[in-house]
Amino acid sequence: MILPIIIYGNSFLRKKCIEIDKSYKDINFLINNMYDTMYQAKGIGLSAPQIGLSIRLFIIEYNNFLKQKFKKVFINPIIIKKYGYNLISKEGCLSIPNIIENIKRKNNIIIEYYDENWKKYKQHFNGLLSIIIQHEYDHIEGKLFIDNIFILKNILIKKNFNLNYNLYKLYKLSKLYKFYLIYRSRYRI
């Protein structure tokens, strides 16, 4: 089942999520629906807050250029350590459509989490997988990738989202304004 994705501007995306336990109902059904939603949206990761659930859960499926597939469920993850050099990569987000920005993140992380079978892991990830995990992890912490960009650019992006509807209205008004200018020139008003 395809679930609706919450879009930037909704305060729900800014909430820090809570942990769940084995008694959480229909976790596998939820995870399958999250994968369906992510595939439909052509994403490589999706977090629970993006679909309106304030729980510490995200999924990732990534195929690298070597055609190696990485598919993983992260329940109650905790990033223990971020280290190494800073890696700058382009990031986008299903909750912030049509915005792609260069973001600086650490190249290496150590993370503890449970999988969908409640098996506990403590793993090291680096490179692009580290970036993807940090991006999704930010969601369950109530953060967005645009929080990590240059402050002025951040303001412009936020204003852009708030003004999308206003731009549409301006477009409509511009047609009226052109009509007004023609009318004014003809009748010398």
From Swiss-Prot:
Its EC number is 3.5.1.88. Pfam families: Pep_deformylase (PF01327). InterPro entries: Peptide_deformylase, Peptide_deformylase_sf. It catalyses: N-terminal N-formyl-L-methionyl-[peptide] + H2O = N-terminal L-methionyl-[peptide] + formate. It is an enzyme of class 3 (hydrolase). One of its GO terms (biological process) is co-translational protein modification. Fe cation binds at residues 93, 135, 139. It comes from the Bacteria. Keywords: Hydrolase, Iron, Metal-binding, Protein biosynthesis. Binds 1 Fe(2+) ion. Its cofactor is Fe(2+). One of its GO terms (molecular function) is peptide deformylase activity. The active site is at residue 136. Belongs to the polypeptide deformylase family. NCBIfam families: pept_deformyl, PRK00150.1-3. Removes the formyl group from the N-terminal Met of newly synthesized proteins. Requires at least a dipeptide for an efficient rate of reaction. N-terminal L-methionine is a prerequisite for activity but the enzyme has broad specificity at other positions. This is Peptide deformylase.
